[in-house]
Amino acid sequence: MSKWLIDPEVDTIDFDFTWLPHYEPQYKFVFKQGVVYDGGNEGIKYMNYPIPKVTYKHRPPLDIVYVSNGEVGEEDRYSRLQTLAGRSVKWVRGVAGRENALREAARISDTSWFILFPAKLWADEHFDFNYQPPNKALPQHYIFYARNPVNGLEYGHQAAVCYNRELVLDTHDYGLDFTMSKPHTVVPIISGVAQYNSDLMMTWRTAFREAVKLTAAGDAESLERLRVWLSEGRGPYCAWSVIGAEDGVEYYDNVDGAHEELMKTFEWSWLEQHFESIHPNFSKTSS
């Protein structure tokens, strides 16, 4: 007789409990997010048996958290997100420092993973707001894609991220990219349009910081993306997107990539001061 072990966090729905293992009957099997885990005498281990279209459980939806800090249009993007998600969306607002805002988002989340939408992201209506991490046994973050309306790039910059709650709270040492400083997986699904070009300062600082990160990464894919940031632009404030990227590369070169100098780019106040020092004749709100 087969015995079934059911995760207490899982609500089973319409699963055929008369199913019997037919690959290796001496083993037990655990279904989890479309793959099978072998639960034999040596303990559970991953077995990549193809089991398509198995509907066996329902997990409660993950918390969705929206993070903003006074961005132009934040109210509209929050309203859209809540409408598309079809449920309440938690809102972290006005917390200084991206890493502090991420920790606050993790703190208020009641689920072990949560999906974070940054304030600049205009949520895509086709995004799966009921997304679940494919392997909850491995603590990592899942980075979606966002579409850049200025230069057409599509990758994880300014995209939604499915964060592991405990991993966020336990992250104290990190590099230029808080999220990528810990185990992560890229999920090439568009989560929205990154509307970072809503005003001059937001456009410039977003491009500046991303250019610093891409320059620091230095791999072929990052450098190709940097080339696009430096050369392509359309729509509102597109010139300041290119200028911001150019200024970011110049700053990286001027400080010889020194880590402590690059980490200053985390702070909005520093970015505004740096902008004023290199563009004294331009107002942060001019066009």
Label for each model-derived stretch:
Residues 3, 10-12, 22-24, 28-108:
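N-terminal anchoring/stem segment of glycosyltransferases
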Residues 5, 114:
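Short aromatic/hydrophobic "clamp" motif used to bind/position activated sugar donors
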Residues 9-13, 121-124:
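A short, conserved beta-strand element in the Rossmann-like catalytic core
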Residues 10-56, 131-287:
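Catalytic-site signature of metal-activated, phosphate-bearing donor transferases
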Residues 15-16, 76, 125-128:
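Short glycine-/acidic-enriched loop or helix-start segments at secondary-structure transitions
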Residues 79-81, 129-132:
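Short, glycine/charged-enriched secondary-structure capping and boundary segments
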Residues 117-130, 176:
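Extended, charge-rich low-complexity interaction segments
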